[in-house]
Amino acid sequence: MNIRYESCLTERYVQSFINNIAFPKSLEELRYFIDEHGCYNVENILFEDETNWTCPKWAKVGDIVFFMHSKTAKATITKLRTCLNSSRCDYSDSEFEEMMSWINRGLELYKRYGGKIFAVGVVAGLPEYFDDQKETIYHWNSPIYCDIVNVVKLRNPIHISKFNSFITVSRQSGITPVFGEEFDKLKCLISKKNTIPEFLRLSISSSLPLSKKQ
């Protein structure tokens, strides 16, 4: 990663967004994650301090990213378990057991993080466009990515029920912009339950960009 973000110890104006991480939508995609990634997207954020991740095209260096595990993931997990059981004869014993183990692991992740903001990070590079995204089977379709660093896991993740009265998490996109009073309230909510990192404590929400649409 070509990191271009330098932290500072003074208050700064930022934009921010929630990155809502979903679950693989099909058995084919689940198989792809097993073979090519070795972990779920949520685990990638949990285990790494920096990453290259989807972002809005208006993201700037220093902006704040709130990582959330999709509330709807449980329904997807249940559907995949049903599909796997119904197509049992299509898999060898070892492959079936491996895929079922992954589904069960996904359910455990959901029980702990589902519908919750569980980590926060900082945009470290300008958005970049990858036009080969259409060739993949990923459950997300955004071709825009940026480097994200200083990923901090929250000791006490924040459930959507605590902030959906003032933030409407997008159902059409994995990205939900968070600005102005929304940012202030979410930051306050997180800080009541967690020791927040310095970069979040010193962040002040900037004005709304030209469009809230990614």
Specify the residue positions occupied by each region the protein language model found:
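Aromatic- and Lys/Arg-enriched surface recognition patch
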Residues: 83, 88-188
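Compositionally biased, charged N-terminal/linker segments
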Residues: 1-61, 66-101, 165-166, 178, ...
